[in-house]
Amino acid sequence: TPAVPALAIVDRPITYDDARIARTIAYRQQHQDPAASGVEIEPKMIVLHHTGGGSADATWRYFDRPTIEASRKTIADAGDLNVSSQFLVDRDGTILRLMPETHMARHCVGLNHVAIGVENVGDPKAFPLTDEQVEADAALVRYLKAKYPRITHLIGHHEYLAMEGHPYFVERDPKYRTRKADPGPAFMAKVRAKVADLGLEGAPAAR
């Protein structure tokens, strides 16, 4: 097993209190496993995202609330657990860890129970993702693969629907699917090029 590489990570935990724990367990019972009783996951894949905005602080504040806002109807109808991710990468490449890596975050339909989520601050038009974020994501993927050798896949959020049919994908609600475009094929290609030696798989359609 390779040594876990040193990586500068800033711990900035969001609220993961009894309210979030209860909502996380309820979400798992509804969507993944009726017998679920905890928030722990066994990481088997990494999902990269972008936030859709330009501020790490704004994203952190949004994720910090345990309960989803009712106006996000499609998501809220599928459970009141707020969205979040284990990591948030700022535009300068600073890596923020928002919760323990093996606690479940709600970031990707069907895969939350096996996936570590990495949100990148930005969006395609106003705040295009940066070279520093490419480097940071690649370093973080390398760190996570060394720490959790069972990780086999690296995908972009826009690729997650192609995982349906794979054993990792579990979603008990056949109608709960969301279309995503983040972070996009160009960003994924850049990150994948930097970690190609790890041999991580993509979603079936992205190989």
Describe each PLM feature range.
Residues 48, 118, 157:
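Conserved, mostly hydrophobic/aromatic
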Residues 104, 117-129:
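Substrate-binding clefts and substrate-entry loops adjacent to catalytic sites
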Residues 1-108:
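N-terminal catalytic cores of peptidoglycan-degrading enzymes
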Residues 41, 80, 111, 126-134:
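Solvent-exposed, acidic/flexible segments
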Residues 109-117:
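Short coil-to-beta-strand
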Residues 1-23, 124-207:
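Basic/polar, cationic surfaces and motifs that engage anionic cell-wall
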Residues 87, 118, 137:
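Hydrophobic/aromatic pocket-lining and membrane-interface residues
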